[in-house]
From Swiss-Prot:
Fe cation 2 binds at residues 49, 86, 157, 196. One of its GO terms (molecular function) is nucleotide binding. Its cofactor is Fe(2+). Belongs to the cyclic nucleotide phosphodiesterase class-III family. This is Probable cyclic nucleotide phosphodiesterase SynWH7803_1390. Binds 2 Fe(2+) ions per subunit. Fe cation 1 binds at residues 9, 11, 49, 198. It comes from the Bacteria. AMP binds at residues 11, 49, 86-87, 198. It holds the Pfam family Metallophos. Keywords: Hydrolase, Iron, Metal-binding, Nucleotide-binding. InterPro entries: Calcineurin-like_PHP_ApaH, CNP_phosphodiesterase-III, Metallo-depent_PP-like. The lineage of its organism: Bacteria, Bacillati, Cyanobacteriota, Cyanophyceae, Synechococcales.
Length: 265
């Protein structure tokens, strides 16, 4: 039973003491990593907006924070994946992190599950796009997963469907309908994870009742929620934990923790 934890939208910057929206991005990301690793995940995923200022130093800061958290927690082997958001520089993200970890587009396998990490970054814009090349790559990976008898989680930054917030829906995934039409044709696809919206969100990919759409809170700051927070903590940082079962079902729960900041190292 692989365990997956999703974190999203840390918005790190080059300076360790740098603040974004009035908060210490690094300190709050360090706390999120500690919370995540306490749950002993097999897979740890960061779904975009990794580096707010898109600097080389910011991605080094991200890499060092993850390395330090793993060492401090004496964590068991965990596979890490990252995807680029609108506040990212995909080439720098890959250059700094890609030697050791999976950077979108990429594949992460755990037991009878396959995690497909996709980039929705579009240069110069806040909205996202998958594009024909990645859609073709996705279908190739899904065909292989079906052959291998694996269930599939797909992860990206931008929500592939409207979430019910007018301002957010204008900067969602421009080819989201095309992506979802493709994914719904593959019975093995059971979950689509995304960030960008800085809040908990949960839905289904109709008419598929077995295909969940899950939006993740930010580790930095929350936006006004569309849906009630099931934990009653809509304004706290958070993440999402998913236990991926052998029968293709998913047991997931929202994670929240205090916004109290640690001293940045």
């Amino acid at each position: 039973m692989p365990r997956l934890i999703q974190l999203s939208d840390p918005h790190l910057v080059a300076r360790a003491e740098g603040r974004v929206r009035g908060r210490s991005a690094l300190s709050l990301f360090q706390k999120a990593l500690a919370q995540a690793l306490q749950e002993q995940p097999d897979l740890l995923l960061v779904t975009g907006d990794c580096c707010h200022d898109e600097t080389w130093c910011g991605y080094v800061r991200l890499r060092d924070a993850v390395d330090a958290a793993i060492q401090q927690q004496a964590a068991r082997t965990v596979c890490l994946g990252f995807t680029a958001g609108n506040h990212d520089h995909p080439q720098r993200l890959r250059a700094v992190l890609g030697r050791h970890w999976v950077v979108a587009p990429g594949v992460m396998d755990a037991g009878c599950w396959r995690l497909l990490v996709v980039s929705s970054h579009r240069a110069g814009g806040c909205a996202g796009v998958i594009g024909g090349v990645q859609l073709s790559w996705l279908n190739t990976q899904l065909r292989e997963a079906e052959t291998l008898g694996k269930f599939v989680v797909v992860a990206l930054h931008h929500p592939p469907v409207p979430i019910g917030d007018a301002s957010m829906d204008t900067i969602g995934l421009s080819d989201g309908e095309q992506l979802m039409d493709s994914l719904k044709r593959w019975p093995a696809v059971r979950v689509v994870l995304f960030g960008h919206i800085h809040q908990h969100w949960k839905g289904m990919a109709a008419p598929r009742s077995d295909l969940s759409l899950l939006g993740c809170p930010s580790t930095l700051v929350s936006f006004h929620p569309v849906q009630p927070c099931p934990l009653g903590r809509a304004w706290d940082p958070g993440g999402r934990l998913l236990d991926l079962m052998e029968d293709g079902s998913v047991q997931e729960r929202l994670m929240r923790w205090s916004a109290c900041e640690q001293a940045a190292g």
